[in-house]
Amino acid sequence: MSLTYFNVMLAFTMSFLGLLMYRSHLMSSLLCLEGLMLSLFVLVTITILITHSTLNSMLPIILLVFAACEAALGLSLLVAVSNTYGLDHVQNLNLLKC
């Protein structure tokens, strides 16, 4: 395992642990999700470059498109919750409350 793979996997693991630990605020959850997507993008890109796989060359671009859509939806949800409740706690997103 090369040092690059180790660093990317460490970034992925730290982002995932951050997503599990800091679930109280929506902004910190969104930042951890962006870290996950960025490390996954780097890992997929490096893997495709090393294996010279031309069939999967569009996969990093598709991953970036999904990451951008996820970021836009997350930020719009953050703005909507902040305008409605005045704070960005994840507990305000419970759909079972009336």
From Swiss-Prot:
One BP term from GO: ATP synthesis coupled electron transport
EC main group: translocase
Database matches in InterPro entries: NADH_UbQ_OxRdtase_chain4L/K, NUOK/Mnh_C1-like
The keyword NADP appears for this protein: no
Keywords tagged on the record: Electron transport, Membrane, Mitochondrion, Mitochondrion inner membrane, NAD, Respiratory chain, Translocase, Transmembrane, Transmembrane helix, Transport, Ubiquinone
GO molecular function: NADH dehydrogenase (ubiquinone) activity
Reaction catalysis annotation: a ubiquinone + NADH + 5 H(+)(in) = a ubiquinol + NAD(+) + 4 H(+)(out)
Topology of the protein relative to the lipid bilayer: Multi-pass membrane protein
Gene3D superfamilies in the record: 1.10.287.3510
Bilayer-spanning residue ranges: 1-21, 30-50, 61-81
Keyword Nucleotidyltransferase recorded: no
One cellular component term from this protein's GO annotations in UniProt: mitochondrial inner membrane
Subcellular location: Mitochondrion inner membrane
EC code: 7.1.1.2
Family per similarity comment: Belongs to the complex I subunit 4L family.
Record's subunit section: Core subunit of respiratory chain NADH dehydrogenase (Complex I) which is composed of 45 different subunits.
General function of this protein: Core subunit of the mitochondrial membrane respiratory chain NADH dehydrogenase (Complex I) which catalyzes electron transfer from NADH through the respiratory chain, using ubiquinone as an electron acceptor. Part of the enzyme membrane arm which is embedded in the lipid bilayer and involved in proton translocation.
Protein name: NADH-ubiquinone oxidoreductase chain 4L
Source organism (scientific name): Pipistrellus abramus
